Amino acid sequence: MRSQFKDDFSFEKRKTESQRIREKYPDRIPVICEKVDKSDIAAIDKKKYLVPSDLTVGQFVYVIRKRIKLSPEKAIFIFIDEILPPTAALMSTIYEEHKSEDGFLYITYSGENTFGTVFPF
């Protein structure tokens, strides 16, 4: 999936920013969170997050749900490299395994299970 953030900023600028963030906040993970293009779920007001490394994927999903004001009965799916991560996984583990070459972790979300693959842990 194409990232709007990657389209808006050059690789060098993204890499420099992620390095600056990691130096200033070594216990935080730089995350870019964007909606899947054709999803009918609400767009998020903020794409860039500094996530505590001990946060779980499930806790991060809760943050996203709050930001887009998603009602409890509605489903949300998040994807990393087009795969559904386990909700109990730590964001630090996901970051180490799936961070982009620019130093950011790219997460997409959707109201439906667009890709349908679960992490092979």
Curated annotation (Swiss-Prot):
<dbReference type="GO" id="GO:0000324">
    <property type="term" value="C:fungal-type vacuole"/>
</dbReference>
<dbReference type="GO" id="GO:0000423">
    <property type="term" value="P:mitophagy"/>
</dbReference>
<dbReference type="Pfam" id="PF02991">
    <property type="entry name" value="ATG8"/>
</dbReference>
<comment type="subunit">
    <text>Interacts with atg43 (via N-terminal atg8 interacting motif); the interaction is direct. Interacts with atg38 (via AIM motif); the interaction is direct and leads to recruitment of the autophagy-specific vps34 PI3-kinase complex I to the phagophore assembly site. Interacts with hfl1.</text>
</comment>
<dbReference type="GO" id="GO:0008429">
    <property type="term" value="F:phosphatidylethanolamine binding"/>
</dbReference>
<keyword id="KW-0813">Transport</keyword>
<keyword id="KW-0653">Protein transport</keyword>
<dbReference type="GO" id="GO:0000407">
    <property type="term" value="C:phagophore assembly site"/>
</dbReference>
<feature type="propeptide" description="Removed in mature form">
    <location>
        <begin position="117"/>
        <end position="121"/>
    </location>
</feature>
<dbReference type="GO" id="GO:0061025">
    <property type="term" value="P:membrane fusion"/>
</dbReference>
<keyword id="KW-0833">Ubl conjugation pathway</keyword>
<dbReference type="GO" id="GO:0005829">
    <property type="term" value="C:cytosol"/>
</dbReference>
<keyword id="KW-0449">Lipoprotein</keyword>
<comment type="function">
    <text>Ubiquitin-like modifier involved in autophagosome formation. With atg4, mediates the delivery of the autophagosomes to the vacuole via the microtubule cytoskeleton. Required for selective autophagic degradation of the nucleus (nucleophagy) as well as for mitophagy which contributes to regulate mitochondrial quantity and quality by eliminating the mitochondria to a basal level to fulfill cellular energy requirements and preventing excess ROS production. Participates also in membrane fusion events that take place in the early secretory pathway.</text>
</comment>
<comment type="function">
    <text>Has a lipidation-independent vacuolar function to facilitate the degradation of vacuolar integral membrane proteins during early-stationary vacuole turnover (EVT) when cells enter stationary phase.</text>
</comment>
<protein>
    <recommendedName>
        <fullName>Autophagy-related protein 8</fullName>
    </recommendedName>
</protein>
<dbReference type="GO" id="GO:0015031">
    <property type="term" value="P:protein transport"/>
</dbReference>
<dbReference type="GO" id="GO:0000329">
    <property type="term" value="C:fungal-type vacuole membrane"/>
</dbReference>
<comment type="similarity">
    <text>Belongs to the ATG8 family.</text>
</comment>
<keyword id="KW-0072">Autophagy</keyword>
<dbReference type="GO" id="GO:0005634">
    <property type="term" value="C:nucleus"/>
</dbReference>
<dbReference type="GO" id="GO:0007033">
    <property type="term" value="P:vacuole organization"/>
</dbReference>
<feature type="site" description="Cleavage; by atg4">
    <location>
        <begin position="116"/>
        <end position="117"/>
    </location>
</feature>
<dbReference type="GO" id="GO:0031410">
    <property type="term" value="C:cytoplasmic vesicle"/>
</dbReference>
<keyword id="KW-0472">Membrane</keyword>
<dbReference type="GO" id="GO:0016236">
    <property type="term" value="P:macroautophagy"/>
</dbReference>
<dbReference type="GO" id="GO:0097352">
    <property type="term" value="P:autophagosome maturation"/>
</dbReference>
<dbReference type="InterPro" id="IPR004241">
    <property type="entry name" value="Atg8-like"/>
</dbReference>
<dbReference type="InterPro" id="IPR029071">
    <property type="entry name" value="Ubiquitin-like_domsf"/>
</dbReference>
<dbReference type="GO" id="GO:0000421">
    <property type="term" value="C:autophagosome membrane"/>
</dbReference>
<dbReference type="GO" id="GO:0006995">
    <property type="term" value="P:cellular response to nitrogen starvation"/>
</dbReference>
<keyword id="KW-0926">Vacuole</keyword>
<keyword id="KW-0968">Cytoplasmic vesicle</keyword>
<dbReference type="GO" id="GO:0000045">
    <property type="term" value="P:autophagosome assembly"/>
</dbReference>
<dbReference type="GO" id="GO:0005737">
    <property type="term" value="C:cytoplasm"/>
</dbReference>
<feature type="lipid moiety-binding region" description="Phosphatidylethanolamine amidated glycine">
    <location>
        <position position="116"/>
    </location>
</feature>
